[in-house]
Amino acid sequence: MRGRMKTLSEIKEILRKHKKELKENYKVKSIAIFGSYARGEQKETSDIDIMVEFYETPDYLKFFELEDYLENILNIKVDLITKNSI
C-alpha cells in the first residue's frame, strides 16, 4: 500500500480533489488531520489520523467503506474517527 511518504500539503490536495465524492458518496461534512502528520512528525511507518464529521451518520459498513476509500486514494493506512467519538 505504501509509496513515497506524502507531505501534509499533498494529502490535503488529494482530499480536496475528492471532496465531491466524499460529500456525495459518504455524506462527509468536514475532515481534519491530527496526530503525527498534523505535527509534522510522521515517519515511513506512520498511519494518518483523520477525524470526519458527517451530514448524516453512516452505518458501520459505510464508515469502513470510507476508511478503505481514504486508504486507497492516499496510499496510507488510515485511522478514522468521527467528531462525535471524541
From Swiss-Prot:
Cofactors: Mg(2+)
Binding-site list for Mg(2+) 2: 47, 49
Listed EC numbers: 2.7.7.108
Domain of life: Archaea
Binding residues for Mg(2+) 1: 47, 49, 79
GO molecular function: ATP binding; metal ion binding; nucleotidyltransferase activity
InterPro entries referenced in this protein's UniProt entry, alphabetically: NT_sf, Polymerase_NTP_transf_dom, Type-VII_TA_antitoxin
Cofactor note: Binds 2 Mg(2+) ions.
Reaction it catalyzes: L-tyrosyl-[protein] + ATP = O-(5'-adenylyl)-L-tyrosyl-[protein] + diphosphate; O-(5'-adenylyl)-L-tyrosyl-[protein] + ATP = O-[5'-(adenylyl-(5'->3')-adenylyl)]-L-tyrosyl-[protein] + diphosphate
Parts forming coiled coils: none
Pfam families given in the database record: NTP_transf_2
Class of enzymatic activity (EC top level): transferase
Keywords assigned: ATP-binding, Magnesium, Metal-binding, Nucleotide-binding, Nucleotidyltransferase, Toxin-antitoxin system, Transferase
Residues spanning the membrane: none
Classification via SUPFAM superfamilies: Nucleotidyltransferase (SSF81301)
Sequence motif GSX(10)DXD motif, location on chain: 35-49
Function, as annotated: Probable antitoxin component of a putative type VII toxin-antitoxin (TA) system. Neutralizes cognate toxic MJ1216 by di-AMPylation.
Protein family: Belongs to the MntA antitoxin family.
Subunit (UniProt): Probably forms a complex with cognate toxin MJ1216.
Protein name: Putative protein adenylyltransferase MJ1215
